[in-house]
Amino acid sequence: MENSSALLITYPDYPVNTDTFYGYTTLVGHAGVLLIKSNGLTKYYEFGRYDPAKNGLVKNRRIPNAQITSDGKPTTSSLKNILSILSTESGKGGRIIAAYFINVDFDKMLAQATKAQPKYDIKSFNCGQYAESVILQGNPRIDRPLIINPTPNNIVDEYIEEGNAEVLFSPTTGEISIGEGDESDAKN
């Protein structure tokens, strides 16, 4: 298994149009997926109702590559820089909460991220479920939580509860924290 990594990202304060009488809400968040190849090559994708018909469209953002440490992980400073850019360009300047996945196959995730996707559906295929599908393609042995509430915020929370490291980024302070995580049983 390739020693690449990925972040299942949520922007928890992102204002989402529910297309109902409720209007906009910040209770569900918006999600994307950050792919980091073992050599530092970095790609970011998100899925949403960006097209006029609101059927769903994959967007990618140009971001800098990560600097990689001797143990194969992105440096904290390069990850902080990437998350700062994503907060501004994809998260409307809001906070980021992410589940960190290790030992995933970059090329398989990239293929999943860029292929034709099902039609957007708030319950059965939203931005969070898209990002999750990309990561699961990178390692089918990842422990999958039972997700009853498929909002982007909840999907990320469930994967953190499964033992993936929690990554927090505050655009206000510029601070990043990366938890330990214990997902080794599913990463071999």
Which residues fall in each region the model found?
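Activation targets extended, charge/polar-rich intrinsically disordered C-terminal tails
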Residues: 106-188
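Solvent-exposed, acidic/flexible segments
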Residues: 24-28, 72-75, 99-106, 120-128
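A structural motif
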Residues: 83-111
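Second-shell loop/turn segments in exported
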Residues: 19-22, 92-98, 113-122
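Compositionally biased, intrinsically disordered low-complexity regions enriched in proline and serine
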Residues: 12, 45-46, 51, 101-102, ...
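A general marker of short, structured functional hotspots
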Residues: 7-10, 40-41, 46, 96-97, ...
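Glycine-rich catalytic cores of cysteine/serine-nucleophile enzymes that process amide/ester linkages
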Residues: 1-92
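Short linear sequence elements within intrinsically disordered, low-complexity coil regions
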Residues: 16, 50, 55, 105-106, ...
